């Protein structure tokens, strides 16, 4: 959503609707002094004599407008920035993990009786001064799209960019070198690892929805989008917050089609908060999680009331304020501001991974092996797209279950509409599609809109032109549709380093352009397309570089288990073992005592517009701006 609401990209520009109230929410200009001080002028005449100022609507206006997004959400977005990261690090001391070796003992401090993270009185101390309430446990998660943006700017590989980010957040020459507390992040996680669980769960969700035995309770009034309902065909991806915001506010009939699966960002936050708070008896509020994402809309996702501790915390006290699973979201551009504010030259950071001796093991051994594997699986092939590869993994899963089948790919009306079919001979096993960009999303939701009932007695329903009569057939024949708000996918997110900023960043960091990589002073559409291709190249580069295959401890670090849908182990698809993922999820559920449904899935709801409502309702919505949390 963020990347397209601008006049620079008219192909996907959405003009304000008739309900847009932003142009009239401006104060009248100060009237000029009248030459006749005794002249009486009515208010209407005074307003009519002054030309109205030109209406200018920006993305910030849209986020702050109660006609689409509540003002509370605009406040929540503004609070999430690199400044908040620095303020939090400077305010709270990093909690020393109680399971670390201290004073020659393993997780036990002889002065306060703390053993394995638990004190004798049931409270956790930090193993240093016994005042855990004065500190926080800092955790960061990084998306591959953000790493690709950084890689393109600094002419490094995606893996090297990830190492530089980890060195900034956790390394000896990173954030800990400045600030009042010397705090840094205990763990830096790769969301690609958690995405594997999302891909497996997405394939299972589609299989369950298409099963003839599945009863779909989502058709009951009021249950649309509920966590315990099965989505209707076609199932629509729910990992893009810009798309979800649009659907909830403008097209509630889409809610039964939305996947109930959490995004990798949300799932990572749930895993971090639920495991650490339960294992070491510390409240979720003492675990501070920042996510580095390619999109500004991810800040809104982090603010959803459904993605808080109240959704999974056993015996949650309703009188207590819930804690977000993701406390703050910053983008790739804001990450560079973070380093600059600390006086750190990002380009000079080591491009090698943190050694095993510098990394704190995750408290649970099985989850530690899952989150920090010895082998790092690269991003999927180009055909899978740059938005996580949900659709393609589902197709590959069905392909593995149907030997002799093949995936047919055909382009739609433009490059951001692609149709997929899994065929075996003349039989079509499953159909799916990809719709990127709001221009194409509008076509999709229009074709999914239910036909209006005839007002004439005995009249037929839908006798007019069907919404799905456009080229490409009926979208209801698709089993799954991957929907992303940004044209080109997540590598083109609004939070990525823009082409107009690249040379400025390189000059500031002292990075020289190589191989004719110098960008034009005023890049046009052609240069923007070439830059996005460079970011995509970094995203898909994976393990092409030999030096990335071995870390500082000599471990092989960049190998794939498999790259096709057919292996000797039937449950392995594109290097992801369904059996292993399900085992990890079951272990996570057992460890925390939380049902897997609450851990993996979420819900969606229709959001009413505040335009045209009485003043008391407007005041009620405005009051949400002072609360912590809140949904769309």
Swiss-Prot record:
Residue ranges with Low complexity bias: 101-119
GO biological process, one term: iron-sulfur cluster assembly
Positions of [4Fe-4S] cluster 1 binding: 20, 62, 65, 68
GO MF annotation list: 4 iron, 4 sulfur cluster binding; iron-sulfur cluster binding; metal ion binding
Keywords recorded for this protein, A-Z: 4Fe-4S, Iron, Iron-sulfur, Metal-binding
Binding-site residues for [4Fe-4S] cluster 2, renumbered to this chain: 240, 295, 486, 490
Gene3D superfamilies: 3.40.50.1780, Fe-only Hydrogenase (Larger Subunit), Chain L, domain 3 (3.40.950.10)
Keyword Iron-sulfur: yes
GO cellular component: cytosolic [4Fe-4S] assembly targeting complex
Function of the protein: Component of the cytosolic Fe/S protein assembly machinery. Required for maturation of extramitochondrial Fe/S proteins. May play a role in the transfer of pre-assembled Fe/S clusters to target apoproteins.
Family, per entry: Belongs to the NARF family.
Name of this protein: Cytosolic Fe-S cluster assembly factor NAR1
Ranges of Acidic residues composition bias in the record: 544-554
Chain segments carrying region Disordered: 27-53, 99-119, 210-231, 542-573
Biased composition (Polar residues): 211-221, 555-567
